[in-house]
A protein has these predicted regions:
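Short acidic (Asp/Glu) and glycine-rich catalytic loops that position anionic groups and cofactors
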Residues: 238-243, 289-295, 322-329
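N-terminal export/assembly segments and adjacent metallocofactor-ligating motifs
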Residues: 1-271, 279, 283, 306-307, ...
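Conserved alpha/beta enzyme-core scaffolds, especially Rossmann-like or related mixed alpha/beta domains
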Residues: 133, 277-281, 291, 326-329
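Acidic/polar loop patches that form or flank catalytic/metal-binding clefts of enzymes
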Residues: 64, 273-274, 310-311, 324-326
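A glycine-rich, hydrophobic/aromatic-adjacent loop/helix-cap motif
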Residues: 317-346
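A generic alpha-helix surface/boundary motif
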Residues: 149, 293-294, 342
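A charged, amphipathic alpha-helical module
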Residues: 287-293, 297-312, 316-319
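Generic amphipathic alpha-helical segments used as scaffolds and interaction surfaces in large
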Residues: 110, 114, 142-145, 207, ...
């Protein structure tokens, strides 16, 4: 450690020691349960699409911690910080605990707490009024998450089928469409990937370890423990890049150029499974002809990546086949060419 860094660190520690103890009381861990009755109930975390199973531990009816279910294949008994932090959301003083009705007050508007009966009567009355005056198909729904299914059934029973999922286009819609166009079906959610048993994993637009799901982080860790090769394509040196054997700091927005160059190398060097392609695919000749102009030297001008690095990583992927995974990613809506990028990944 350099002298300058040591002085800076010492100053930071000294400042921390000077903080009054009273200011740190809010940072203490939650108390352990007392002598009351503790009940453990199974639950499912609904914060993300992984829907990890767990248990809520409650003392005298008050939850005090959440733990993972060891029999759940999504979490393997371990929850992410959002899952274990669910108690914080439950105890949050700003959490809505009853319906609120928008009302006029003076020159503005505010929300007035109402009972569930009053809220449901108000909503039912407005829905009936709209149906009588304009028709039930004048009610639309913008939905997301697991709760959407319940409201969808209500909407259909009401007489409307006008529904949309804006998050589909903002998140994984291009991925689902790209894989459906290539394979005839989409990836699904959770993603149907066997990352744990892969010998080579390619992350291109997939920031696992920073913004993806608990189960995938565990699968990636298990794969690396088994000796898998990790290739990360990312303009920045991400957490995953720090774990990778190869980091490709690509120019933003040029992922398709790299994918085309990889295909060029794999096809022209006969690194693909020709028997599989002949038996199960259509249109391969058209793909082969299409990628001919897109060699690593061409991709270098687009992506800023060394042609030798492009060739090396393409050969690594081919050498590990069929246990090579190019991760499909999530939150894949970036530059307007996202469906085509996902088709290239597929």
């Amino acid at each position: 450690m350099k002298r300058r860094d040591f002085i800076r660190l010492s100053a930071t520690l000294g400042a921390g020691a000077a903080v009054p103890v009273s200011l740190l009381t809010g940072c203490s861990s939650p108390p352990l349960p007392g002598s009351g009755e503790v009940r453990v109930s199974p639950t499912v975390c609904d914060i993300c699409f992984w829907k990890c199973a767990g248990f809520v531990h409650a003392e005298d009816g008050k939850p005090w911690k959440v733990t993972g279910n060891p029999h759940d294949p999504h979490s393997d008994g371990r929850l992410c910080t959002r899952g274990t932090g669910g108690i914080g959301a439950y105890e949050d003083p700003d959490r809505l605990r009853q319906p609120l009705l928008r009302v006029d007050e003076g020159d503005g508007q505010t929300f007035r707490p109402v009972s569930w009966d009053e809220a449901l009567e108000f909503i039912a009355g407005r829905m009936k009024e709209i149906a009588d005056q304009h028709g039930s198909d004048r009610v639309a729904m913008l939905a997301h998450g697991s709760g959407a299914g319940h409201f969808k059934r209500l909407l259909h029973a009401y007489g409307s089928h006008i529904e949309a999922h804006p998050s589909y286009a903002q998140c994984r819609g291009p991925r689902q469409l790209g894989f459906a166009l290539t394979y005839g079906e989409d990836v699904g959610s959770p993603d149907r990937t066997d990352m744990e048993h892969s010998r080579c994993i390619v992350l291109i637009g997939s920031h696992i370890g920073e913004n993806l799901h608990n189960g995938q982080v565990q699968s990636l860790t298990a794969a690396l423990d088994r000796g898998a090769t990790l290739i990360t394509v990312d303009p920045r040196f991400s957490v995953a890049a720090g774990k990778s054997s190869h980091w490709l700091p690509i120019r933003p927005g040029t992922d398709i150029a790299l994918l085309l160059a990889w295909m060029n190398v794999v096809i022209n060097e006969n690194l693909y499974d020709r028997d599989y392609v002949a038996r199960y695919t259509t249109g391969f000749e058209e793909l082969r002809d299409h990628v001919q102009p897109f060699n690593p030297e061409w991709a270098w001008l687009e992506t800023g990546l060394d042609p030798a690095l492009i060739r090396e990583t393409a050969r690594l992927m081919a050498a590990s086949a069929p246990a090579t995974l190019v991760h499909p990613g999530r939150h894949v809506t970036w530059y307007g060419d996202d469906t085509q990028r996902e088709r290239a990944i597929a």
